[in-house]
Design a protein with these regions (language model features):
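Glycine-rich phosphate/ribose-binding loops and adjacent secondary-structure elements
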Residues: 115-285
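Short, low-complexity, polar/charged sequence segments that are solvent-exposed and flexible
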Residues: 16-18, 55-59, 89-91, 140-145, ...
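C-terminal accessory extensions appended to soluble enzyme cores
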Residues: 214-370
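A generic structural signal for short, solvent-exposed coil/turn residues
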Residues: 28-30, 115, 172, 320
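Residues in well-ordered beta-strands of folded domains
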Residues: 71, 124, 329
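Short, solvent-exposed loop/turn segments at secondary-structure junctions
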Residues: 4-5, 42-44, 75-78, 128-130, ...
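Residue-level preference for short coil/turn positions at secondary-structure junctions
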Residues: 32-33, 66, 117, 144, ...
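Non-catalytic, usually N-terminal nucleic-acid engagement modules in DNA/RNA processing proteins
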Residues: 1-113, 269-312, 366-370
Length: 370
């Protein structure tokens, strides 16, 4: 993404100097011919009246950074009304976003042709309903786009995405390629094999490693889908905001918290070596975890409910010990550390594990659909 909020100026300069593929360490022999797509990071300017970048800036950026594919600068429309309201029935601000996305797409593809840009242009589709998105897609085809990037999907329910894709496929040419932008329903990909989708992007396997309340660790399910496990939360006592606030307010003792933190870590690592039972490990983990819950809420009934729920989820993780069944590079190298929700490094590693599991899941899904 060309969103300016993501990298420092120094990093941006290095990316433009070395090219995006090398910058992202995606330049190995196995990846040299793979797709490298750029977009405008439209979430970063969602509250602005217009996109943060002009078509000229975007074409220049994609060219300099060496992308193989580039999406026209769009402006996100979040709502998707299945009753298909007409143009004069939608809010002026929504219609303005639709029009600027279409106008940018025209200017963008004109510039790609004029400059003989070395990437394939992808036309961004935005709309307030399945019908308006289908009309936008046909408009992009008429401009000359052969690859469409479908936006605004992130907040939509799976059933609504189906309706959108049905409307799109009905309206556009069968050979027109489709990319799903920010497909947050990545675990439902098996439902979408019938729409001729060429590609999609999703951060959910990575993000869920450290942002989801319960599904932090992906695992192949014997039934063919995906299973999810809760990572075991043992934060650093003196770096966790909730715990530090509790210490400052005199509710917790720093020494006591650090002692419980170490006890939980030792128990979990001993469990991994077969030296401690799942039950005693669970007790040590929950003995520390209760302070996190107490630091978040003073509602005793809610605390009890949250602790019981977490105890069930952590108990399942310990019972199944999924990291022992996984032979990916991450789990083979770090073992039980991958399941500990603690520092940035561990959480990132778990994210990479999830990506590997998810990649395999997509491959299997595609093979089964043939």
């Amino acid at each position: 993404s060309s969103s300016k909020v993501r990298y420092s100026t120094k990093e941006e300069q290095r990316m433009l100097r070395d090219g995006a593929r090398k910058f992202l360490r995606y330049d190995g022999p196995a990846f040299k011919d793979s797709m490298l797509m750029g977009d405008c990071g439209a979430f970063a300017y969602v509250d602005h009246d217009k996109p943060a970048y002009s078509p000229e800036e975007v074409v220049e950026f994609y060219t300099e950074a060496g992308f193989t594919h580039g999406v026209s600068p769009d402006h996100i429309i979040f709502d998707c009304d299945l009753s298909n309201p007409k143009y004069d029935e939608v809010a002026p601000a929504t219609l303005a976003r639709y029009k600027v996305t279409q106008a940018n797409a025209q200017a963008f593809i004109d510039l790609v042709r004029e400059t003989d840009a070395p990437f394939e242009p992808m036309g961004a589709v935005q709309g307030w309903s399945p019908e308006s998105m289908a009309q936008a897609a046909v408009g992009l085809e008429n401009m000359g786009y052969k690859y469409l990037a479908i936006g605004g999907l992130v907040p939509l329910k799976v059933e609504v995405i189906h309706v959108v894709l049905q409307a799109l496929r009905k309206a556009i040419k069968p050979e027109t390629k489709i990319h799903l932008l920010g497909f947050a329903k990545a675990d439902k990909i098996h439902e979408f094999t019938g729409y001729g989708i060429t590609s999609f992007d999703s951060t959910s396997p990575l993000i869920r490693a450290f942002k989801d309340a319960k599904a932090n660790y992906y695992m192949d399910s014997p039934g063919g889908g995906l299973d999810y496990y809760t990572a075991i939360r043992i934060p650093q006592a003196m770096e966790n905001t909730r715990l530090v606030q509790g210490i400052k307010r005199g509710i917790f003792s720093a020494e006591d918290l650090q002692r419980r933190e170490q006890k939980a870590l030792v128990a979990l690592r001993s469990f991994d070596r077969g030296e401690e039972s799942a039950a005693s490990t669970l007790n040590a983990v929950m003995d520390y975890h209760r302070f996190l819950v107490e630091g978040e809420s003073e509602d005793v009934a809610r605390q009890g409910k949250d602790l019981a729920k977490m105890k069930d989820m952590v108990g399942r993780t310990l019972q199944d010990a999924p990291w022992k069944r996984c032979n990916c590079d991450v789990c083979s190298a770090v073992g039980v550390e991958v399941i500990i929700f603690r520092s940035s490094n561990r959480n990132k590693r778990r994210g990479f594990h999830n990506l590997g599991v998810y990649h395999k899941h997509v491959q299997t899904t595609m093979e089964n659909a043939r």
